[in-house]
Amino acid sequence: MSQQHTLPVTLPPALSQELLDTVPPPVNTQQEQRKQPAALPPPCQEVPVELPVEGPSKHEEKHMTIVKGAPEQECEQQQQPQEQKLQQQHWEQDEEHQKAENPEQQLKQEKAQREKQQLQGQLEEEKKLLDQQPDHELAKSDEQLGTKKEQLLEFPEQQEGQLKCLEQQEGHLELPEQQEGQLKCLEQQEGHQELPEQQEGQLKHLEQQEGQLKHLEQQEGQVKHLEQQEKQSELPEQQRGQPKYLEQQEGQLKHLEEQKGQLKHLEHQEGQLELPEQVGQPKHLEQLEKQLEHPEQQEGQLKQLEEQEGQVKHLEQQEEQLKHLEQQEGQPKHPEQLEKQLEHPEQQEGQLKQLEEQEGQVKHLEQQEEQLKHLEQQEGQPKHLEQLEKQLEHLEQQEGQLKHLEQREEQLELPEQQVGQSKHLEQEEKQLEHPEQQEGQLKHLGKQEAQLELPEQVGQPKHLEQQEKQLEHPEQQEGQLKPQEQQEGQLKGLEQQERQLEQPVFAPAPGQVQGIQQALPPKGEVLLPVEQQQQKQEVQWQHK
């Protein structure tokens, strides 16, 4: 009976064996799929996956033992739920693994799952139909089932190909999990690479700063040159044409204040650039830092410039006074103006004080020379030293000029070198013929003496030429010395004579003028009262 029962079942066991032989490959393919992710970066390997590998072997043993005397339907019914469970487990695991990988893969997997579910539904319907069909139709249905199962088996192979393609795409697209790990690595690498990049940027910035500091050094040289020019402008010979130049200097001072703000900004930037051991930093930066450590010196220089501006304004006032004196010289000298000038001896005293202040300025120039020497020691720059040497030579020339001017002032104070002596003497001889004009002449002489005490009046070149001509003729000078000494005596007694001019004055003859002048006491003698002098003059006229 067993043989008769087994004879019709010979074909189905072959099919069942084929099914049993074909079922395990999905497990192997899925194992291969799980082995492939091992090639992925470390973040992708963290997903733990455990596969029930021993399951298929047990099922195979059971099916092999049951096939001996079991019908075809029982084998198929036992195999189908087990296969479905295994496939569902694998699908769920694949879904979980793929969800962690990429959302695009999830969509593709969902489509594949839908197709599988449709195929499974079709298989179940066909199996139900097979249960109802007779045995002769089982062969055809088994063939159809085999083809469909082959399709099912081929489907995971397609999935493997798709997974490989996706893995290749992932190698280009970098999954977010891989990206996190790679970003960390990149951040570490960038942390090492950012230093040279930052250093390069800093070097460029430092080069720009060097250019700015060189420009500032040039401007400092210009400022020093301006200081020299301002010092030169303190000299009375260089008082003209300064107002426009002063406006330029004020603009330059404003520009210097802006540069001070830039220097402070650069110091702030250097404080921020505290990276250790910058690559290839020039040695020039150390020198620049040392220079920036002394902003107080720059402030002191600016204060000196401001003080010099005040001095320049004072010089402008002196220029206006000189212009006023020029206008007065060009106008005819009336006795009323002369009286007003004699009434203000305080102005003359103020002018003498100005001369003393100028001498103090010369001393200040010497102090500034010492400061320049000190700056030379601090800076130690050859180009700047050459400029300073030129400046010192120029200052020495200026000192020589000042000494020469002082000598000229001393010469002008001497009575032997009075300005326009010959012309004034002729005018005085003509005016002495008229006793009414003696008062105006005396006042005029007082004004001349006051003007001779002023420093460097306009028109000195003409007077100097006259003096040179006079020096060429010493005989004339000897003849002129006597009346000059007499004029000095007259000037000293002007104030006393003005008070006593109410007494009558006798008009001398034209030839008697020189006798009157000789009657006056020479330089250094004591003057007698006005009445005694007049009596002497009357006696001399009577004798003549």
UniProtKB/Swiss-Prot annotation:
Region Disordered, residue ranges: 1-520
Chain segments annotated as coiled-coil in the UniProt record: none
Superkingdom as given in the UniProt entry: Eukaryota
Residue ranges with Low complexity bias: 76-90, 477-494
Location of the protein in the cell: Cytoplasm
Keywords: Cytoplasm, Keratinization, Repeat
Tissue: Keratinocytes of epidermis and other stratified squamous epithelia.
Biased composition (Basic and acidic residues): 96-117, 124-152, 202-234, 252-271, 283-297, 304-347, 354-411, 423-437, 462-476
Tagged with keyword Cytoplasm: yes
UniProt keyword annotation of Cytoplasm present: yes
PTM entry text: Substrate of transglutaminase. Specific glutamines or lysines are cross-linked to keratins, desmoplakin and to inter involucrin molecules.
An annotated GO cellular component: cytoplasm
GO BP term, pick one: response to UV-B
Major localization listed first in the record, in broad terms: cytoplasm
Protein family according to the UniProt entry: Belongs to the involucrin family.
Protein purpose: Part of the insoluble cornified cell envelope (CE) of stratified squamous epithelia.
Subunit structure comment from the entry: Directly or indirectly cross-linked to cornifelin (CNFN).
Protein name: Involucrin
